[in-house]
Amino acid sequence: MTITDLVLILFIAALLAFAIYDQFIMPRRNGPTLLAIPLLRRGRIDSVIFVGLIVILIYNNVTNHGALITTWLLSALALMGFYIFWIRIPKIIFKQKGFFFANVWIEYSRIKAMNLSEDGVLVMQLEQRRLLIRVRNIDDLEKIYKLLVSGNAANLLI
């Protein structure tokens, strides 16, 4: 096993750990989920480039009669990339005291202002940065509004 194979195993393990955390662990952290809203995906061109480069590496490894384990590891990395970028659905998960956005926990008390843009992007101003929340279905913005003004997140609006 070469150092390249070890690096590939490390990347595969990191992507697998992220996928498990995103799908199974994060929704169970910080209490019960009050609302989970699917978000729009970001540009897919990065994922096409990533998977395309992996396919080129697989082709190069096969034509140069490289190690079979390297080919399998590159294939596994391509499949993990395909899952992360194309199958997995990004979402915002609202809990009792805050929400997960881009896999980061944000408490409601950190929100300084909220605005809705004309194109349906919810903008939340935090202490030092802005969150641009692009929901997949525009009707989900009403669900978010109802959750934030209900008793579940009333401390945010006081």
From Swiss-Prot:
InterPro entries, sorted: DUF986
Keyword annotations for this protein, in alphabetical order, are: Cell inner membrane, Cell membrane, Membrane, Transmembrane, Transmembrane helix
Q: What ranges does the Cytoplasmic topological domain annotation cover? A: 27-44, 88-158
Instruction: Give me the segments passing through the membrane.
Output: 6-26, 45-65, 67-87
Bilayer topology reads: Multi-pass membrane protein
- Pfam entry (one): DUF986
| Periplasmic side of membrane | 1-5, 66
| Residues in the signal sequence | none
Any idea what this protein is called?
UPF0266 membrane protein YobD
Organism of derivation: Shigella flexneri
